[in-house]
């Protein structure tokens, strides 16, 4: 950035601050609630692997977030997970500027605008364990900037697009790049039907990875059904294309008991082919290494019931059974085998 540009930015900043000061002097102070809001999610569960006869208790999520408004147009959010599979992770850290109701600009770390299921927070999930799309194939948080715009053409159309480092929050100190990752998402919110299309480009190594996702959600009364498909392509044929699918249905049944407010039976089918995270492994002085299979091809059928002790997604007990089907030669990770899951989720 040259001196002329820097000087212009400083002058614009001074003018903005002067205008704001004059506004307050004229008695036009904004009626803004600046009290920070503290929210959190705790997910604790017991899992029993039916084939191995082994079980475990786990605190899967212990998230705490602080969000609020600085002015009518400026807001912020910071969220941390104190126990993401035993690790402390910074999740969100961003400032959002919304000059009017249809336009917003966000800068910082956030979940990039891509897919349906990966964008659900833990308290908004329908099942105890996420789909393959949300967990392995399309799950990305990164540092960058994003623009969102909403149209109303008889129904809302929401478009979000952004550019991102590719470094994540923890690796950004000495991270410099000549290129950027990008992600874009369009939501068509028809009555009772949501159509979502999204695309993303990442570059974990010298191999660029392009992803394309499409999904439809149907909701009517207490019934919801959703299907989502993701296609992943690696440049230079570094790895074969990846396909992933997720489909589920859920029906809410209100009940009148002192403890349980709603019972929701649900079923899911998801699938993914052999998958690489895009990073090279087994590098030597003479070889860059190669992309490997990080997740083997598998199908999964999940069935269960959710007991809501309050409003939906506030205090839920999720009881699931997961049945896995691996391809011949596929290696199952320790936590991805046939199992019964009982999870308690609390949102505050």
Where are these regions (language model features)?
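N-terminal periplasmic/intermembrane-space "pro-region" immediately following the signal or transit peptide
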Residues: 1-9, 18-43, 348
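Outer membrane beta-barrel
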Residues: 26-168, 178-180, 186-194, 248-250, ...
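Outer-membrane beta-barrel pore domains
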Residues: 50-52, 71, 96-98, 118-120, ...
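Active-site cleft segment of glycoside hydrolase catalytic domains centered on the general acid/base Glu
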Residues: 172-176
């Amino acid at each position: 950035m040259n001196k002329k540009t820097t000087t212009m930015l400083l002058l614009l900043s001074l003018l903005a601050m002067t205008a704001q000061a004059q506004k307050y002097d004229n008695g036009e102070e904004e009626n803004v609630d600046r009290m920070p809001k503290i929210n959190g999610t705790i997910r604790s569960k017991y899992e029993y692997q039916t084939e191995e006869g082994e079980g475990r208790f786990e605190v899967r999520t212990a998230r705490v977030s602080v969000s609020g408004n600085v002015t009518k147009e400026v807001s912020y959010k910071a969220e941390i997970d104190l126990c993401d599979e035993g690790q402390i992770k910074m999740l969100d850290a961003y400032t959002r500027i919304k000059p009017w109701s249809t336009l917003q600009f966000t800068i910082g770390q956030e979940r990039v605008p891509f897919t349906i299921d990966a964008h659900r927070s833990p308290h908004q999930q329908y099942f105890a364990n996420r789909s393959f799309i949300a967990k392995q194939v399309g799950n990305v948080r990164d540092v960058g900037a994003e623009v969102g715009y909403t149209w109303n053409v008889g129904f809302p159309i929401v478009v979000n697009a952004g550019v991102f480092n590719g470094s994540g929050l923890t690796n950004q100190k000495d991270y410099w790049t000549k290129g950027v990752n990008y992600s874009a998402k369009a939501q068509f919110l028809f009555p009772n039907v949501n159509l979502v299309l999204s695309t993303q480009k990442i570059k974990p190594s010298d191999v660029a990875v392009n992803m394309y996702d499409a999904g439809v959600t149907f909701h009517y009364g207490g019934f919801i059904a959703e299907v989502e498909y993701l296609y992943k392509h690696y440049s230079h044929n570094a790895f074969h294309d990846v396909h992933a699918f997720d489909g589920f249905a859920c029906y809410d049944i209100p009940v009148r008991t002192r403890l349980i407010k709603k019972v929701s039976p649900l079923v899911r089918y998801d699938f993914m082919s052999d998958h690489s995270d895009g990073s090279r492994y087994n590098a030597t002085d003479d070889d860059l290494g190669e992309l490997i299979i990080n997740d083997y091809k598998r199908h999964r059928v999940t069935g269960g019931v959710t007991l809501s002790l309050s409003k939906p997604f506030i205090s839920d007990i999720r009881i699931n059974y997961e049945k896995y089907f691996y391809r011949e030669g596929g290696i199952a990770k320790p936590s991805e085998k046939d199992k019964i899951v009982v999870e308690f989720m609390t949102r505050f």
